Amino acid sequence: MAVPQSKTSRSRRDMRRAHDFLVTVNRSVCANCGAAKLPHHVCPECGFYKGREIVKKAVEA
């Protein structure tokens, strides 16, 4: 079986893990309703994308 030849130093271990951090999710504001949404995605609240209604939402009575 493979066995490490020498102990990995803290510096080398941390440099290897430098790119493993979590990336924060970028949010944008919907121009139609003002809700938070992902960029380049249809708004989950109102169904609009680039000023056009893509998904028809049922009107609550």
From Swiss-Prot:
Any one Gene Ontology cellular component term annotated for this protein: large ribosomal subunit
SUPFAM superfamilies under this entry? Answer: Zn-binding ribosomal proteins
Keywords from UniProt, A to Z, are:
Ribonucleoprotein, Ribosomal protein
**UniProt-listed Gene3D superfamilies:** Single helix bin
Q: GO MF terms on file?
A: structural constituent of ribosome
Per the UniProt entry, what is one GO biological process? translation
Question: In its keyword annotation, does this UniProt entry include Ribosomal protein?
Answer: yes
Family named by the database record: Belongs to the bacterial ribosomal protein bL32 family.
Instruction: List the protein's name.
Output: Large ribosomal subunit protein bL32
**Species:** Acidithiobacillus ferrooxidans (strain ATCC 23270 / DSM 14882 / CIP 104768 / NCIMB 8455) (Ferrobacillus ferrooxidans (strain ATCC 23270))
